[in-house]
Amino acid sequence: MPEYDLIIRDGMVIDGTRMPRFRADIGIKNGRIAKIGRLRAGDAAKSVDASGQIVAPGFVDLHTHYDAQLFWDPYCSISSWHGVTSIVIGNCGFGFAPVRP
């Protein structure tokens, strides 16, 4: 049985720690990163070739104006196109959207 569900192979990893980028494989198990490093070919049920690609964690956009946009674009599509996986809303001192306390 494979050790990982998925291996992202040979990507250029930028991990957000200010460490220089590095080439590595990423082993995913149960939806979580289990290992970063050089992994054996048969260690996963599936693999994705990330050669020539940058692999990074999801970005957090700390300044958005999505308070109202959530009503007509519930997926905040433009953010996900750029690797953003989390957003902060209402941080400008006001919000457009009605909310419950």
Give the predicted meaning of each segment.
Residues G16, K29, H65, I89-G90:
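Acidic/polar N-terminal loop/beta-strand segments that form early-domain functional surfaces
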Residues W72-P101:
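Divalent-metal coordination cores built from histidine and acidic residues
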